[in-house]
């Protein structure tokens, strides 16, 4: 059966290759702003991922396995998505430096033939080292932080500033492979 990744993320595409060597990419038009945070971060990221997957399900005519994900960073119950601009990235990193935060990914797998929807989420704790303003500005000049939740990429230059990680590394990159593997086995 055809496998579809509902994501424009290059990182998610590179990670999915480890589980599935043949898949199509269809980018969702789902408006993440439609999802309202109520009281559970796990439910919130799962619902965003579900919205993306359902958007693709409505667009395709054939049976397929659809995979979607959403990743956010939280600090002191504050959600940090992708920065709006360099100043926003600076402020996010300034908040994270020298502290522990959590990265949540919601993952959804839909088997359209079975009309089966599997939702899950994974949380990983990350400890950032202390950074001075010059280090933060230098990192932002690389442009790496500008398209990532929490304004850093653990798999890139941002990994230099990670002191410790508790949980799934791939979750922080954007696709928790171990959890996704289990979900795909259940879906097929």
From Swiss-Prot:
GO terms for cellular component: cytoplasm
Active site (UniProt): 70
Principal location: cytoplasm
Cited SUPFAM superfamilies: ITPase-like (SSF52972)
MF-aspect GO terms: dTTP diphosphatase activity; UTP diphosphatase activity
Enzyme class label: hydrolase
UniProt cross-references to CDD domains, sorted A to Z: Maf
Purpose: Nucleoside triphosphate pyrophosphatase that hydrolyzes dTTP and UTP. May have a dual role in cell division arrest and in preventing the incorporation of modified nucleotides into cellular nucleic acids.
Family named by the database record: Belongs to the Maf family. YhdE subfamily.
Keywords, alphabetical: Cytoplasm, Hydrolase, Nucleotide metabolism
Pfam families membership: Maf
Protein name per its UniProtKB record: dTTP/UTP pyrophosphatase
Cofactor(s) listed: a divalent metal cation
Catalytic activity: dTTP + H2O = dTMP + diphosphate + H(+); UTP + H2O = UMP + diphosphate + H(+)
Subcellular location: Cytoplasm
GO biological process, one term: nucleotide metabolic process
Site entry: Important for substrate specificity: 11, 71, 155
PANTHER family: BIFUNCTIONAL DTTP/UTP PYROPHOSPHATASE/METHYLTRANSFERASE PROTEIN-RELATED, BIFUNCTIONAL DTTP_UTP PYROPHOSPHATASE_METHYLTRANSFERASE PROTEIN-RELATED
InterPro entries: ITPase-like_fam, Maf-like
Keyword Hydrolase in record: yes
Source organism (scientific name): Clostridium botulinum (strain Eklund 17B / Type B)
């Amino acid at each position: 059966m055809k496998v579809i990744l509902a994501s424009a993320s290059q990182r998610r595409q590179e990670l999915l290759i480890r589980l599935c060597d043949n898949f199509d990419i269809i980018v969702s038009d789902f408006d993440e702003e439609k999802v309202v945070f109520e009281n559970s971060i796990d439910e919130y990221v799962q619902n965003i991922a579900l919205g993306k997957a359902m958007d693709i399900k409505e667009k395709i005519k054939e049976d397929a396995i659809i995979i979607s994900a959403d990743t956010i960073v939280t600090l002191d119950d504050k959600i940090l998505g992708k920065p709006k601009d360099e100043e926003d990235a600076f402020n996010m990193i300034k908040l994270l430096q020298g502290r522990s935060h959590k990265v949540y990914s919601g993952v959804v797998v839909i088997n359209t033939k079975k009309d089966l929807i599997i939702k899950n989420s994974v949380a990983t704790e990350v400890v950032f080292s202390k950074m001075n303003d010059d280090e933060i500005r230098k990192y932002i000049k690389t442009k790496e932080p500008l398209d990532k939740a929490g304004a850093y990429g653990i798999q890139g230059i941002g990994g230099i500033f990670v002191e410790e990680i508790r949980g799934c590394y791939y979750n922080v990159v954007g696709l928790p492979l171990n959890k996704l593997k289990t979900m795909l086995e259940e879906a097929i």
